[in-house]
């Protein structure tokens, strides 16, 4: 349903943001 796809999109965006944050930390280390 709508909520399931919304949660999936939010989870995907959060995962991408977390991955970017980790990559930035590694690059600065």
Swiss-Prot record:
One of its GO terms (biological process) is defense response to bacterium. Expressed by the skin glands. GO terms for cellular component: extracellular region. Its main location: secreted. Coiled coil: none annotated. Keywords: Amphibian defense peptide, Antibiotic, Antimicrobial, Secreted. It is found in: Secreted. Pfam families: DD_K. It comes from the Eukaryota. InterPro entries: Dermaseptin_dom. Belongs to the frog skin active peptide (FSAP) family. Dermaseptin subfamily. Has antimicrobial activity. This is Dermaseptin-J8.
